[in-house]
Amino acid sequence: ISWPSYPGSEGIRSSNCQKKLNCGTKNIATKGVCKAFCLGRKRFWQKCGKNGSGSKGSKVCNAVLAHAVEKAGKGLIAVTDKAVAAIVKLAAGIA
């Protein structure tokens, strides 16, 4: 897996990441998960910099992890949406 290209200082911003993933637009409950993901992603890029070596070649900064972080966003939000929908359905059944 090749190291994903550095998204740039604007690209790693949590607000931009949230916009890209449409955080909380379909369901407010997903906003928290989305925000947490985007903040984690931002910290990852801040730590790992442009080439994945970071300071002292941190073990955190490897291509596999970076690739996973970039790909995880959409899947994470989709799973959360499903979970929220299930909870809402369940709550409606109880009420």
UniProtKB/Swiss-Prot annotation:
One of its GO terms (cellular component) is extracellular region. GO terms for molecular function: toxin activity. It comes from the Eukaryota. Keywords: Cytolysis, Disulfide bond, Secreted, Toxin. One of its GO terms (biological process) is killing of cells of another organism. Disulfide bonds join C17-C38, C23-C34, C48-C61. Signal peptide: none annotated. It is found in: Secreted. Permeabilizes a variety of cells. Forms large pores which allows the release of large proteins almost as rapidly as small organic molecules and inorganic ions. At sublytic concentrations, the toxin also inhibits protein kinase C and endogenous voltage-gated cation selective (sodium, calcium) channels occurring in the nervous and cardiovascular systems. Belongs to the worm cytolysin family. This is Cerebratulus toxin A-III.
